[in-house]
Amino acid sequence: MILKFLIWALLFGSVWVSAEPILPLHSVATDARKVALGRQLFFDTRLSRNNEVSCASCHQLTTHGADNTARSKGVAGRLGDVKAPTVYNSVFNIRQAWDGKAVDLKAQVTLPVENPKEFATSWPVLIATLNKDKAFLDAFTQVYKDGLSSDTISDAIAHYERSLITLNAPFDLWLQGKGSLSEQAQEGYRLFKYYGCINCHQGKNVGGNMFAKMGTFGDYFGDRGTPIEPADYGRYNVTGREADKFTFKVPGLRLAARQTFFFHDGSEHSLTGAINTMARYQLGRSLSQAELEAIAAFLESLVGQHQEMTQ
Ligand code: HEC
Ligand code: HEC
């Protein structure tokens, strides 16, 4: 009898645990000395032309790891082509950028450096500038004996980004049986699964692990009311495959409730508006206001903490 129960518990207990499609966030291994150097570089405006902006100008860590605009301003106030995503929890993404053009965090660093709408510089110029700072160079060389290069600078920044994980979200604590969750948020989670948001937004980061077309059940771009821009082609710009047109990396939703603009084009500026658009264009559904609010409450419960955050 006891044996039977044990076998049952083993089978179904483990099935239940692994069947939950969202998992709690956890920290990942990283090197503290590299994290410290990476942090310095992340906030250093000398990485950009004329010392105008740093990574942190667009990825504001005190809020949600992005800025509160639809399009970020790079050097000389130039506006970017897409909305800045958060850097928090980005280590869990299968690829970086909306179209996945960077294979990992380290590869991503070159994009803002060379982008004329972001840092508008080059590695040789940037390295020459930093090499003049004797104190920084000494500290850097103690950790990276080969000194400053695109490889070592990118590595340090990527290490810092690996440390940007938001822990102890109310939802995670509830999943682990360590905290309670409001009825409304629980209902939101149920709807999130029931309607199929979970088919795309899943795993630790509630997204970030696959690509999907924007507008599965409707012509999102046709209805948007603004002309299609090159960035709207998404993953197609990287692969050239017809099937990848209008396809984007499914964004992680861990900090979605903190955002003020949504989607790659920053076209939506309310959370319930974004959920409504998703229901309509990705699932062919029309949700009630109460359902939208329940899902918003669930998304709010996904917001964890990090020491860089002030709220
Ligand atoms: C001028 C604003 C701006 C600056 C400066 C900037 N970024 Fe970004 N960042 C963006 C935008 C916009 C995107 C989206 C780009 C795309 O998808 O093509 C992005 C994407 C990213 C991503 C991918 C996140 C994801 O979920 O795909 C990471 C990581 C990142 N930036 C880190 C950095 C780092 C590190 C620096 C400094 C070396 C930096 N950014 C500088 C605006 C900026
Ligand atoms: C078919 C896959 C798919 C489904 C189903 C889906 N999404 Fe999305 N979601 C995406 C993609 C892809 C994007 C990015 C689209 C873009 O930027 O143009 C996105 C973006 C979002 C955003 C904006 C995040 C940001 O950083 O701007 C929110 C919020 C969101 N989804 C919530 C939901 C909710 C809630 C549901 C269920 C009602 C849902 N999604 C269903 C694929 C999906």
Where in the sequence are the language-model features?
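Sec-dependent signal peptide recognition
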Residues: 1-8
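Hydrophobic h-region of N-terminal signal peptides that target proteins for export
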Residues: 9-17
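Periplasmic c-type cytochrome electron-transfer domains
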Residues: 16-311
